[in-house]
């Protein structure tokens, strides 16, 4: 069976990796704020850049998360979303609660370990993607700015880029109306 894969950020990287490793299993791709080649050089969010560049054992990161989690979550979310009004107390509380779940930090820490696999294994082959591909990008993305999405669009032959105004790295949350419309229209073609 084949599936249309939809992924945001690292999830878009997984979707691209799946399309390259098992093209026969993929029918279409929807990449939302997708993972580019040269992630460390392309990321502009100071918090995410710091997380990628700071090696720390997971026990230390877990302790830091326990101690400073709420402040860290708010800082990261302010860099990720365009409209800070979305960061209501309820959203921050829920995000912090999710971040405090036991065992959440070690899997997040594996990003540093798996980034070389992405860069050396899949990122160098993005131009080989042959599936119909929709790229959705927030015009105000501060994790990977719009020119990164435009470059991804040029690299994946035949792809379509949809720019979402007044949205950052999570346009499906910030502008679900425009994001969902673009995805549904693409998947129904």
Model regions and ranges:
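Flexible "cap/lid" loop of the alpha/beta hydrolase fold
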Residues: 20, 27-62
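Short beta-strand/loop motif that positions the catalytic acidic residue
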Residues: 129, 135-137
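Acidic catalytic loop of the alpha/beta-hydrolase fold
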Residues: 140-144
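Alpha/beta-hydrolase fold nucleophile elbow
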Residues: 1-9
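Catalytic active-site module of serine/aspartate enzymes centered on a nucleophile-bearing elbow/loop
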Residues: 158-189
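Hydrolases whose catalytic domains are alpha/beta-hydrolase-1, hotdog thioesterase
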Residues: 14-18
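Short alpha-helix in the alpha/beta-hydrolase fold that links the catalytic acid
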Residues: 91, 122, 131, 145-154
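Conserved alpha/beta-hydrolase catalytic His-Asp/Glu region
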Residues: 40-43, 64-128
């Amino acid at each position: 069976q084949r599936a249309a894969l939809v992924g945001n950020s690292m999830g878009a990287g997984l979707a691209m990796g799946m399309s390259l490793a098992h093209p026969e299993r993929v029918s279409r791709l929807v990449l939302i704020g997708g993972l580019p080649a040269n992630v460390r050089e392309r990321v502009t969010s100071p918090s995410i850049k710091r997380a990628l560049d700071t090696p720390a054992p997971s026990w230390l990161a877990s302790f830091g998360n326990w101690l400073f989690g709420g402040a860290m979550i708010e800082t990261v979310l302010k860099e990720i979303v365009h409209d800070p009004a979305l960061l209501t107390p309820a959203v921050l509380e829920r995000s912090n609660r999710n971040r405090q779940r036991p065992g959440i930090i070690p899997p997040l820490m594996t990003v540093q370990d798996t980034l070389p696999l992405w860069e050396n294994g899949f990122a160098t082959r993005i131009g080989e993607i042959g599936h119909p591909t929709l790229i959705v990008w927030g015009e105000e993305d501060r994790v990977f700015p719009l020119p990164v999405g435009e470059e991804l669009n040029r690299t994946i032959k035949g792809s379509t880029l949809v720019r979402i105004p007044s949205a950052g790295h999570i346009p499906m949350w910030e502008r679900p109306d425009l994001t969902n419309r673009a995805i549904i229209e693409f998947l129904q073609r």
